[in-house]
């Protein structure tokens, strides 16, 4: 019976989050999450949505219909990040929301796109091997790395230094992240603008 199989599937998805769902002391909203530490992680309902629709489930469509500020953008990013397998991800959004979507990817997307971590500048030193390694690791064109004479790379062994970077460095890093996101995501503006 398909209904019985579906119920078992849903129960299996909810099981890891049972304690989070029953915790009434946890008063986190999309507006307050990450305010103390600057680090953003998915909320429980976003994790459930991410686990419901991914490469390993038979479902390929989902309508997210929540109120304003409930985390729909981060939910859609979590789904997209869970579905990536080397192919481009297509995002359909009004032109007016494209910049917001890019900034949200930097907050709740793949760790490589997040600004709040330790960043170190790696100079290419006109070395083709360094350029190729950076290109592969960051999914950036070699021309981009040559033009900028290097690239930003994360160091997961050190603490967040983003707020210590100069304004010029932050701009350079954000331009690189935008380029990396543009290489992974294709934006289509459904209002034609």
Please report, for each region that a protein language model flagged, where it lies by residue.
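Residue-level preference for the first positions of well-ordered beta-strands
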Residues: 61-63, 88-90, 184-185
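Conserved Walker A/P-loop ATP-binding site and its immediately adjacent core
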Residues: 70-160
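Helicase-associated low-complexity/disordered flanking segments
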Residues: 1-37
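Short His-Asn-centered micro-motif
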Residues: 65-67, 92-95, 188-190
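Conserved RecA-like ASCE ATPase "motif II neighborhood" in helicase/translocase motors
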Residues: 167-171, 180-193
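Conserved pre-motif I regulatory segment
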Residues: 25-65
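Short loop/turn elements that form and flank the Walker-type P-loop nucleotide-binding site
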Residues: 58, 85-86, 181
């Amino acid at each position: 019976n398909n209904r019985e199989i579906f119920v078992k599937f849903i129960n299996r998805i909810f099981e890891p989050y049972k304690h989070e769902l029953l915790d009434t002391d946890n008063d986190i909203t999309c507006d307050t999450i990450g305010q103390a530490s600057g680090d953003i992680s998915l909320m429980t309902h976003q994790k459930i949505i991410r686990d419901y629709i991914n490469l390993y489930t038979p479902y390929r469509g989902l309508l997210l219909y929540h109120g304003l500020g409930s985390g729909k953008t981060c939910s859609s990013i979590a789904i997209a990040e869970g579905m990536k397998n080397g192919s481009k991800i297509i995002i359909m959004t009004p032109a007016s929301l494209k910049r917001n979507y890019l900034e949200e990817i930097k907050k709740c997307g793949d760790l490589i796109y997040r600004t709040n971590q330790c960043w170190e500048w790696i100079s290419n030193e006109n070395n083709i091997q360094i350029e190729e390694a950076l290109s592969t690791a960051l999914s950036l064109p070699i021309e981009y790395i040559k033009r900028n004479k290097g690239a930003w790379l994360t160091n997961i062994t050190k603490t967040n230094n983003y707020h210590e970077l100069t304004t010029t460095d932050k701009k350079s890093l954000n331009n690189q992240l935008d380029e990396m996101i543009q290489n992974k995501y294709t934006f289509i503006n459904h209002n034609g603008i």
